[in-house]
Amino acid sequence: MKQAAVIGGGFGGIAAALRLRSRGANVSLYERLDALGGRAQVFKKNGYIHDAGPTVITAPYLFYELFELFGEKLDDYLEFRPLDPWYRFNFHDQTQFDYGPNREKMLSQIEKISPNDVGGYLKMLKEANTIFELGYQKLAGHPFHKLMTMIKYAPAIIKMRGYESVYTFVSRYLEHPNLRQAFSIQPLLVGGNPFQTSSIYALIHSLEQKWGIYFCMGGTGKLVKELEKLMLRQGIKIKYQHDVEHLSTRNNEISELHFTNGHSHKFDIIVSNADPIQVSTELIGRKKISLHNAFVNKFAKHSMGLFVLFFGSKKQYKNVAHHTIW
């Protein structure tokens, strides 16, 4: 049985650990904090429980798959409740726009704001579907870990106009500034700037239309907790407060983890869910990284950070949707 290690207990690390285990590997997951979740951390204060990271689920099938790998059903442990609307926009001119699953209702709202944009939206959706089919369904499963791989798929990226920004893409089809804002907001979900992020991210619009947007009852922390239980049921070892200090390489392969507590372990398979630039520059070292990673590190730009305020309220605001954006 191969020995596998996963660095990082975010959703990516959890998924990697479960998939490795389903293929027969003996898996150990190392998390530097005292809880799993990564950006999906949970904190409690004054009797309130806050999800510090994501609060919606846009590709539920990915989580269903993880339970199905072991003959289990997600619905036996979790409830994904569909949201309607998905987002509510309150604009500076006092107009409101609900973006949600009801196509006819949404088209009616677009017509009230800008009649000329109804046809434009349908054309935009058609093009977004094309980007989704090519960018998500055909390319998302391919690893872009080598420079030649990126070059190979460059024509497809050009075909999708990946050199344009999401806002430029949306503006080709919609005229009204409020609608342009509403339909170019998706990059913010991944820390991107709509005016700079590649138009490939317009596929998120199609992804939302295809699978919907859901809230996990009990919060995202509930989802993390049930995935943690699933890992434990399957014999995955979870090591908390294990901070990786550096990685040893042998024959151009990473073979050993070294931790800040002085311990080290060798593995047959190592998967990292940590920040790629941190891994290549700090954990591996600049002198040992590949030409591809050196190229990426030189030109990569970090996404924006956020300043987030969390409020606790004893009152329910029925006119405030789950995601309300001013």
Predicted segment positions?
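Mid-domain catalytic core of redox enzymes
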Residues: E245-W326
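N-terminal glycine-rich phosphate/pyrophosphate-binding loop and immediately adjacent elements
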Residues: K2-T130
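Rossmann-like flavin
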Residues: H92-T197
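Helical element adjacent to the flavin cofactor pocket in flavoenzyme catalytic cores
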Residues: L203-I254
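Generic, well-ordered alpha-helical scaffold segments in large soluble proteins
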Residues: R19, R23, F169-Y173, A182-I185, ...
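Short Gly/Pro-enriched turn/cap motifs at secondary-structure boundaries
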Residues: L78, I158-K159, K298-S303
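Extended, hydrophobic alpha-helical segments in both membrane/secreted and soluble proteins
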Residues: F11-A16, L223-L227, M231, Y240-V244, ...
